């Protein structure tokens, strides 16, 4: 008997079947390194971005926003250290000639055996041929930067890099933002945008791709207050995920050992989600790094520009330390889907039960907020239902569905996470009211049309 699909596999199947995510270039075979977000996926992604922006940028008096360029001057990446040290340890299987990140092979070994490989690659089996052990090329560095060329000739004079993080645009604009926004430390700059990394082994659905989106903050503080702010941003980040429905038992904090910190980091703690990948149970959702004064100082040195701050109250000048909460947008999307996914038995019209697939998404994240479902395609019901859907659509995403049995339509809405379904029936023609069904409890309530919009706004946390 075939093994039942894992929860993660079920979510991936649902995501592709219902239009959350499609393989990019699917008609040409697709690629593991990039995915397209379909009608439901783009709505979910936009809702996550909106909640993040409202929580961390627009909703705080000590934050401002920025949208910096994807292609920055090459000098930026030379100064930041990325050209020199932004690389991964690459090894190649002598059996299959597939390439792997050596650190990922070591992590998988440790997860299985409870300790790191004593002899390095000599202890590692080929993933496709477990009986073959130690058949690897020597480890060598592999640049994670994606190159492109600007101008009419593809030579070194036109060499540029696609940004591997959004942070550097914030650092290079620091002085301009400081002057024009009239902010002073402690304050932060938030940004949402695409980044690109030449991953050796993209995979695990949308978790590790070469093109992805980040939601990043660079928070500038007075030296000596950085550890306190570091702890604050860890707590705020944790609360953001749990406040939007992530179960606390499915996330954890992971502190990077000193010897594995990034070249810019004084301290880093990741928040990881229990995706239960094959060979690696946990995956990074976001990280908070104490970048100290590394970035501003290195750009001062290489650009010759003053990126310090003068504190008039203390009559002293200093280079701010930076606390960086960096969220992976598409990883967050994947975690919200996995955490919300559920299969349960629900009563059917015949007195028995059927399997119900449901996404218990927070209403603020749900790609469709309300479904309008006329009981039938009756010529009297349809105009009322369509008019209601058009009116509700002015404030929120609405799905109109008049195809099939009402129970089947409820199930279709449940599996994409629609919080509320509004049924227009023949009584609606007489009493000017509709039946509102709750996704999670399946309870139904009769609501007058006159107060429906206010009722929905309260239930959907729009007010």
UniProtKB/Swiss-Prot annotation:
Reactions the enzyme catalyzes: tRNA(Gly) + glycine + ATP = glycyl-tRNA(Gly) + AMP + diphosphate
Places the protein is found: Cytoplasm
Regions annotated as coiled coil: none
Record: residues binding ATP: 197-199, 207-212, 284-285, 328-331
A Pfam family this chain is assigned to: tRNA-synt_2b
GO CC aspect terms: cytoplasm
Primary subcellular site in the record, as a coarse category: cytoplasm
Positions contributing to substrate binding: 101, 165, 212-216, 324-328
Enzyme Commission code(s) on record: 6.1.1.14
Top-rank EC class of the record's enzyme: ligase
Subunit structure: Homodimer.
Homology family: Belongs to the class-II aminoacyl-tRNA synthetase family.
Protein name: Glycine--tRNA ligase
Gene behind this protein: glyQS
